[in-house]
Amino acid sequence: MAKQIQFDETARQALLRGVEQIAKAVKSTLGPAGRNVVIDKKFGSPLITKDGVTVAKEIELEDPFENMGAQLVREVSSKTNDVAGDGTTTATVLAESIYREGLRNVTAGANPISLQRGIMKAADSVVEELKKISKPVDSSKEVAQVATVSANWDAEIGNIIAEAMDKVGKDGTITVEEAKGIETTLDVVEGMQFDKGYLSPYFVTNAETMEAVLENPYILIHEKKINNLKDFLPLLEKVAKSGRPFLVIAEDIEGEALATLVVNRLRGVLNICAVKAPGFGDRRKAMMEDIAILTGGKCITEDLGIKLENVGIEDLGQAKRVVVSKDETVIVEGSAKSSDIEARISQIRRQIKDTTSDYDREKLQERLAKLAGGVAVIHVGAATETEMKEKKARVDDALHATRAAVEEGIVPGGGVALIRAQKAIDTLKLEGDEATGAQIVYRAVEAPLRQLACNAGREGALIVANVKGMKNTAEGYNVATDKYEDLLSAGVVDPTKVTRSALQNAASIAGLLLTTECVIADKPEKKSCSCGSGASDMGGMGGMGGMGMM
């Protein structure tokens, strides 16, 4: 396919037009006074959103050169969302500001490579300063504040996320689902939960709820299938003598072994329940080892060299309570040593850090959550499907922002932290175009606060000047109340990770755009005209008319 090429200033200006178009759409959503964007969908009702990355992902421009600029800024937004889960609009505002200001200097004759170096050095110094002014998240109240700000000042969402984190801990799993009603609610599953239910309904102890509830049971964790009763019988007799319930977790239980368990359950000889092990392959083995550690038992595998007929009571795990339904099993309060669980958690954390697969990372985080505390489910309710989707997106944003805050701490919100970190650029001893690049970042970090003020109908430059004149580093402009106040006390906070990621990603892409000298795109194909075939058809019809006149 033929290509079209643009060079120098023509190329950079085309990229700038694309950057400005996507930035104009995205930055209108910034802050509590930001506006909604309505996105048309081919199927179903239009999507209404205030989420920057959602808006950015929908934008595709007609001009291929302008579209390149738009897509690169979209990359800033997406990357920030992937790393921190929030701050996508801030990242877009920063990227546009750095690129526009930098392009002005390149046009005036500055060396783009030196500008890029200065931009990156200034961004790194601001990031280090942000880390210094960062404050750790210590209380549930601070978690609620972060979540409220990220959810566009929805206190209900903020409080529910804080409650969920309080119950399952910072390593616990919190999932977001659509509710059937209009209320937003929180459900918490304590203990280890996995998606495998009983192998036979005859194991049920509560006919109303169709659940098998085992109080203070012994737990067998077996890697292979159990189908030979002869090997299993010695252990069954030992457990029956103890008089305690018995949970069997194995790859599968079938044939005479399963039939014997069912008969013993029906006769009341033994309160027993059998379930399949969760997962597949190596992940199944790892999850069974997790269950063994949680319950203080052994995972009976071929590697250990222990045969089923030789398993003793001391090899079994124990728990305070086990609830098994048709589709899932929940083990509450396993009798493990806390040191063993901590060691396992540390091991999984190392695996999360080392893995390069997003899928593996997600599964490892699920395992970590199940060991660490439990699973919380936030059911998002709303009056209409459109409102529910918009609200669910805000809950997801708030959840990611809260995790980021717990990880790296918080800084004053409302764009103030970036302005307070400006002073770090003054300490850099740069010369020439590198110093110019640093000054570009110095001015760009004011852009988020300026945009917040503009969206609220205020004069951005005046607000920035007033904030810079304040002596208390936590003081700034609260857009929600239209007041200058201590933002940390007022609960206007941003996660350090979000602010840091937004600046780093914006500086990276803007620097690359500035050093662009040539852009190449596919040449659009000319649409072939179908006039010729239409004319010949008409001619044929005319001939037929002539025949009719004869």
Swiss-Prot record:
<feature type="binding site">
    <location>
        <position position="50"/>
    </location>
    <ligand>
        <name>ATP</name>
    </ligand>
</feature>
<keyword id="KW-0547">Nucleotide-binding</keyword>
<feature type="binding site">
    <location>
        <position position="414"/>
    </location>
    <ligand>
        <name>ATP</name>
    </ligand>
</feature>
<feature type="binding site">
    <location>
        <begin position="86"/>
        <end position="90"/>
    </location>
    <ligand>
        <name>ATP</name>
    </ligand>
</feature>
<dbReference type="GO" id="GO:0005524">
    <property type="term" value="F:ATP binding"/>
</dbReference>
<protein>
    <recommendedName>
        <fullName>Chaperonin GroEL</fullName>
        <ecNumber>5.6.1.7</ecNumber>
    </recommendedName>
</protein>
<feature type="binding site">
    <location>
        <begin position="478"/>
        <end position="480"/>
    </location>
    <ligand>
        <name>ATP</name>
    </ligand>
</feature>
<comment type="similarity">
    <text>Belongs to the chaperonin (HSP60) family.</text>
</comment>
<dbReference type="GO" id="GO:0042026">
    <property type="term" value="P:protein refolding"/>
</dbReference>
<dbReference type="InterPro" id="IPR001844">
    <property type="entry name" value="Cpn60/GroEL"/>
</dbReference>
<keyword id="KW-0067">ATP-binding</keyword>
<dbReference type="InterPro" id="IPR002423">
    <property type="entry name" value="Cpn60/GroEL/TCP-1"/>
</dbReference>
<dbReference type="InterPro" id="IPR027409">
    <property type="entry name" value="GroEL-like_apical_dom_sf"/>
</dbReference>
<dbReference type="GO" id="GO:0005737">
    <property type="term" value="C:cytoplasm"/>
</dbReference>
<dbReference type="GO" id="GO:0140662">
    <property type="term" value="F:ATP-dependent protein folding chaperone"/>
</dbReference>
<feature type="binding site">
    <location>
        <begin position="29"/>
        <end position="32"/>
    </location>
    <ligand>
        <name>ATP</name>
    </ligand>
</feature>
<dbReference type="Pfam" id="PF00118">
    <property type="entry name" value="Cpn60_TCP1"/>
</dbReference>
<keyword id="KW-0963">Cytoplasm</keyword>
<dbReference type="GO" id="GO:0051082">
    <property type="term" value="F:unfolded protein binding"/>
</dbReference>
<keyword id="KW-0413">Isomerase</keyword>
<comment type="subunit">
    <text>Forms a cylinder of 14 subunits composed of two heptameric rings stacked back-to-back. Interacts with the co-chaperonin GroES.</text>
</comment>
<dbReference type="GO" id="GO:0016853">
    <property type="term" value="F:isomerase activity"/>
</dbReference>
<dbReference type="InterPro" id="IPR027410">
    <property type="entry name" value="TCP-1-like_intermed_sf"/>
</dbReference>
<dbReference type="InterPro" id="IPR027413">
    <property type="entry name" value="GROEL-like_equatorial_sf"/>
</dbReference>
<dbReference type="InterPro" id="IPR018370">
    <property type="entry name" value="Chaperonin_Cpn60_CS"/>
</dbReference>
<feature type="binding site">
    <location>
        <position position="494"/>
    </location>
    <ligand>
        <name>ATP</name>
    </ligand>
</feature>
<keyword id="KW-0143">Chaperone</keyword>
<comment type="function">
    <text>Together with its co-chaperonin GroES, plays an essential role in assisting protein folding. The GroEL-GroES system forms a nano-cage that allows encapsulation of the non-native substrate proteins and provides a physical environment optimized to promote and accelerate protein folding.</text>
</comment>
